[in-house]
Amino acid sequence: DTYNNIKNNNYFTVNHISKSMIHDGHRNSASYDSTVSEFDKTNLKEEYKEHLEIAFVKDSPVQLYCKYVNEYYIKENDTVQIIAEIEHLFFEEQMLSKDYWLQLDKGNVITINGLDGYALPKIVDRFEYARPNIDIKSLLENGA
């Protein structure tokens, strides 16, 4: 299972899914036996990066390679929150803006709404850092 894999390996990947991957991405939310690879149950393919031992999801528009740091038990819903460091970040080049901001909608990255709803984000605007008593300016209108 995912939790034991993280604890045993100390590393894990987080892979954003695109619109074409939502069916298989949703299938991965099922609780498989720990001996079953989710890659064997979907059309998603493994991808390994040089010098990194944990698999990514091939064709994922954003891929994060994370190191386990700590965890906190949350009694209110009987779950564990994992704290991790992002050691490597891979993404499709067209998603990177001039100011090095990653625009997820350019990669057709899917957002999840609840447990079973999927949507495509659309950027409405970006703003400068907010400061008291100073007008807020749009970064998009200023060419960011």
Q: What does each of the following model-derived ranges do?
A:
Residues 1-144:
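Basic, polyanion-binding surface patches
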